[in-house]
Amino acid sequence: MKTLIKNAVLLDMVGDKPNAHKTDILLEDNKISKIEEKIEEDDCDIIDAKEMVVMPGFINTHTHLAMSIFRGYKDDQKLMDWLENAIFPVEDQLRPDDIYWNSFLSCIELIKTGTTTFNDMYFRMDKTIEAVEQSGLRGVIAWSI
């Protein structure tokens, strides 16, 4: 299957500063096969990306995917008070499936915001790895210390 993205503004990071230029991008089997100013290709789906920007995926170097469910929870406290009195007691109640679904939710959020690679640390990493594999993202994953 081929997809041709036409008329995109490509933001590349070649050199000392970002460079933007109009380009076409050909995808074959969901992988970039050609990037040129003008591509003519038959028998493919065409996406008109006029006034849209194509750029490298973002990289998030510090995540705790399974903690997405705690976002905003009792966040008016100092860090150690928040961890010891709010987060740790709730984390003790998390089941393996909770870790999986919280991590999967975070993967969806990363994808929707253009993040393609991340670094994650937590516990029950087997469940986080399972969610990441399902999502197709790239991750560097380690146990929290």
Can you annotate each of these PLM segments?
Residues 69-100, 108, 140-145:
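Active-site gating loops and adjacent loop-to-helix segments of metal-dependent hydrolytic enzymes
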Residues 19, 73-76, 133-134:
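Short, glycine/charged-enriched secondary-structure capping and boundary segments
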Residues 14, 19, 67-71, 121, ...:
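Active-site-proximal flexible loops/turns
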Residues 36-44, 130-134:
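Short loop/helix-cap segments at secondary-structure boundaries that form the rim of catalytic
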Residues 100-145:
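Divalent metal-dependent hydrolysis catalytic cores, especially in the metallo-beta-lactamase
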Residues 1-41, 52-53:
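N-terminal metal-binding scaffold of metallo-dependent hydrolase/deaminase domains
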